[in-house]
């Protein structure tokens, strides 16, 4: 069953019925002011940090679902009937409904009782405000007298405190209303210099700023008293629940239309200009008022929306492809890079599965997000790398996350994840290949614990590698610490207390529990760093880290090979995990992908055998499982992984993040059909026809899909904020299509499915444009046999760097 369709020409997903299996959301904003919005206008907004600067409220896991948002109500003043153009929250039957989720904007349109309404929501580039543009048309044969009511419930800034500290918060809320603008200024008198505002372009028939006055006692968003009676209470909030509502009234002749603009925004005043007059408690509106006036104009809104769409066209021009597969085309050209931008901005902090309170910018997560983002906005990627490096500790370890507002690292989600530092090496390597900006390696960056002074980024990378090589276990494999990439494989935790966090509880000591996965990751990172060292003229460093990579590869093949696949780890007692000798948890996906990606097993047959084991033991029609057999009881020595019911999350689901590692590995060994087959299984567009099973959005990747051990096999969860986005873009574009940036040029080395006759692509790379045509005349899953650059045959598959501003014609033939 489908709930909509793709509009590829407009880069939109069109939802044609409002009752999607779960709310299907989109993100507003691209830089500092952000929001999530569902297909029925649910969601909320924040400035930079969804915990510390939350602008509007939203209630998770609530009944009814998706409660609270950017609501507009229309009321026929002649009959007294009212409804929501977005369906929620009134849920009246609509004669027509459509939601178009686009790139950083959402447009919801509907018709009821002969009145057509369209609401466009977006954040203009460079602004700290969002626009709600309402257009209403009278399609009746008679005049209509209408009222439009807006609704936005303010959060008292700190989302965690707002949801828990009621004894204080019921008495702190403050607002001002001036010239039709509602200003939310809780705590502005004392500790804050920022406020929110809510404005309307129409002369107001009324307003409300106290939620209970707007809704009425014991009423919900579905039947607000003010809307029902058609008259605002003109309430001014003092404590309780500050809320913003405007009442605009207008009359439309048959065929006439009306446009009303609502603005919800955030503003900061300089500390010495907070009040007007100085010394009073009255908000100084002089600086923000010109911004409000400008954006309440229709021509400003129209121009701002054009700029937003133009900016996305420019960003996505970094790579466009035309392949024989529509699902591939729309994901590569639009939705996958769009999701990569969202994960870059949000990390894992804010979605309908992440509350925006407990998680900030994850170290490991954001390093991997760079892989899919760097070609879109290299300058922003550079800034993120330096932020991440400043979260590193002098030991070479790193805080597991930091807050986006303060940039300060913290242990709120635990510490001692021993894979974290290695991802920084790979993130920097991806940036260097895309940009050639080796100057970043000389940039001085402080360590988060300030035990040493600022050091060049190059040294940070060295310490990342040393952190691993200094922490080896009995088999000379890396110690796992609290966990590696798999946060739920907690081999030093031994948690038996109900409610205790596996991520933050104290670990037992003893350097025994080892990770084969980190071994593969280290070999890959050390090899990449050796290449960086070579380019810096540091031959000794390069030789040393190549030797370290070889040593680790030897340890993995000696102690991490189980006969048909790579083992997963050794536990606190030195017992093997991920082995045929285990009753459950015999084979894990992570080391099969990572070890092969690092080159381990490519020359001795281990890689091919490990991938064959993946096909026979882990692959399903919905994707590749993380582990099999799933754990059926809780194992104290394994931790959180065994706490999940079989088939969910890390315990036997299709954990989509790891699937692309196997796609890359299959491409590396020349198996184009296998690589592309795995790609299609979790491609959201390819799963659109089973939306009633998949349930999550068909235009973005989800973190997990329930496995066959689960009652709801095929059901996705945790959509949007997942490393799946970056890694799938890497797998399809860099390894299956084979277009990947390298320091000395652009590699064109596809490994295609045999059914394809070829494809074309346009890649913007270091200022030049590469027009690429790949032909597969014999319909084989082979490698490039012939490569021509501007009509000249080139040996190998590396297209040399071209001068900025030039266009290069690349012709490749698979044979």
Protein language model annotation of sequence segments:
Residues 1-365, 379, 384-387, 430-434, ...:
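Anionic coordination/interaction segments
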Residues 75, 361-366, 370-381, 385-479, ...:
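Aromatic-rich carbohydrate-recognition surfaces in CAZymes
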Residues 139-143, 269-271, 434-448, 526-545, ...:
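Inter-helical turn/loop segments and adjacent helix faces that build the functional surface
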Residues 149-151, 166, 399-401, 521-641, ...:
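Catalytic cores of carbohydrate-active enzymes
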Residues 320-334, 379, 383, 388-397, ...:
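Active-site acid/base region of carbohydrate-active enzymes
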Residues 351-366, 409-419, 500-519, 575-602, ...:
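Solvent-exposed loop and edge beta-strand segments that line ligand/cofactor-binding
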Residues 741-772:
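Surface beta-strand/loop "capping" patches
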Residues 788-792:
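Short strand-turn-strand beta-turns centered on an Asx-Gly dipeptide
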């Amino acid at each position: 069953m489908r709930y909509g369709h793709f509009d590829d020409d407009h880069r939109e997903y069109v939802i044609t019925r409002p009752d999607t299996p779960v709310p299907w959301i989109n993100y507003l904003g691209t830089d500092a002011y952000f929001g999530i919005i569902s297909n029925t206008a649910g969601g909320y907004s924040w400035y930079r940090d969804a915990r510390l600067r939350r602008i509007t409220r939203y209630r998770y896991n609530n009944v009814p679902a998706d409660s609270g948002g950017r609501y507009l109500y229309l009321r026929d003043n002649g009959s007294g009937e009212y409804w929501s153009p977005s369906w929620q929250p009134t849920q009246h039957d609509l004669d027509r409904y459509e939601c178009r989720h686009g790139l950083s904007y959402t447009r919801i349109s509907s018709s009821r009782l002969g009145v057509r309404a369209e609401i466009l929501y977006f954040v203009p580039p460079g602004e700290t405000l969002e626009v709600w543009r309402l257009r209403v048309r009278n399609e009746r044969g008679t005049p209509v007298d209408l009222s439009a009511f807006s609704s936005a419930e303010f959060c008292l800034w700190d989302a965690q405190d707002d949801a828990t500290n009621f004894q204080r918060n019921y008495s702190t809320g403050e607002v001002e209303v001036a010239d039709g603008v509602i200003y939310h200024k809780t705590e502005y008198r004392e500790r804050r210099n920022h406020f929110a505002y809510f404005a309307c372009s129409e002369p107001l028939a009324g307003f409300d700023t106290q939620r209970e006055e707007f809704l009425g006692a014991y009423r919900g968003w579905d039947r607000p008293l003010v809307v029902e009676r058609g008259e605002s209470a003109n309430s001014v909030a003092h404590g309780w629940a500050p809320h913003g509502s405007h009442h605009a009234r207008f009359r439309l002749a048959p065929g006439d239309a009306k446009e009303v603009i609502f603005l919800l925004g955030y503003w900061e005043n300089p500390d010495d200009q907070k009040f007007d007059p100085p010394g009073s408690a009255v908000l100084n509106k002089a600086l923000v008022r010109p911004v409000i006036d400008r954006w309440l104009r229709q021509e400003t809104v129209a121009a701002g929306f054009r700029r937003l769409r133009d900016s996305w066209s420019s960003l996505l021009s970094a790579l466009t492809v035309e392949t024989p597969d529509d699902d591939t085309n729309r994901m590569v050209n639009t939705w996958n890079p769009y999701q990569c931008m969202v994960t870059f901005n949000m990390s894992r902090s804010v979605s309908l599965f992440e509350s925006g309170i407990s998680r900030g910018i994850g170290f490991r997560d954001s390093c991997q997000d760079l892989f899919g983002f760097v070609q879109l906005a290299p300058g922003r990627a550079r800034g993120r790398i330096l932020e991440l490096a400043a979260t590193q500790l002098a030991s070479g370890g790193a805080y597991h996350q930091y807050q986006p507002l303060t940039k300060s690292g913290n242990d709120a989600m635990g510490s001692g994840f021993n894979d974290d530092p290695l991802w920084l090496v790979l993130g920097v390597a991806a940036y260097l290949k895309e940009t050639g900006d080796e100057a970043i390696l000389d940039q001085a960056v402080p360590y988060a614990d300030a035990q040493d002074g600022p050091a060049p980024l190059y040294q940070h990378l060295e310490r990342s590698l040393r952190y691993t090589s200094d922490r080896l276990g009995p088999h000379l494999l890396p110690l796992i610490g609290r966990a590696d990439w798999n946060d739920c494989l907690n081999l030093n935790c031994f948690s038996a207390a109900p409610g205790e966090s596996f991520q933050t509880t104290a670990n037992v000591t003893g350097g025994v529990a080892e990770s084969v996965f980190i071994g593969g990751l280290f070999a890959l990172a050390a090899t990449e760093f050796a290449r960086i060292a070579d380019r810096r003229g540091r031959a000794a460093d390069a030789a040393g880290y190549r030797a370290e990579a070889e040593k680790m590869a030897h340890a993995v093949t000696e102690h991490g090979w189980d006969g048909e696949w790579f083992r997963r780890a050794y536990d606190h007692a030195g017992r093997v995990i991920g082995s045929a000798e285990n009753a459950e948890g015999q084979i894990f996906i992570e080391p099969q992908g990572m070890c092969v990606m690092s080159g381990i097993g490519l020359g001795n047959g281990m890689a091919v055998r490990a991938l064959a084991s993946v096909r026979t033991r882990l692959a399903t029609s919905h994707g590749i499982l993380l582990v099999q057999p799933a754990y059926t009881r809780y194992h104290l020595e394994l931790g959180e992984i065994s706490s999940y019911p079989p088939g969910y999350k890390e315990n036997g689901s299709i954990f989509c993040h790891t699937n692309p590692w196997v796609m890359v590995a299959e491409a590396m060994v020349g198996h184009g059909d296998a690589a592309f087959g795995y790609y299609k299984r979790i491609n959201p567009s390819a799963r659109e026809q089973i939306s009633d099973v998949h349930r999550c959005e068909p235009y973005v990747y989800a973190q997990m899909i329930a496995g066959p051990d689960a009652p709801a096999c095929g059901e996705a969860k945790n959509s949007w904020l997942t490393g799946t986005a970056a890694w799938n873009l890497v797998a399809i574009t860099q390894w299956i299509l084979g277009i990947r940036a390298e320091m000395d040029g652009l590699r064109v080395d596809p490994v295609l499915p045999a059914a394809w006759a070829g494809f074309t692509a346009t890649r913007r790379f270091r200022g030049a444009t590469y027009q690429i045509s790949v032909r597969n005349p014999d319909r084989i899953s082979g490698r490039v046999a012939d490569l021509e650059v501007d009509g000249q045959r080139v040996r190998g598959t590396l297209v040399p760097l071209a001068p900025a501003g030039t266009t290069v014609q690349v012709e490749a033939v698979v044979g």
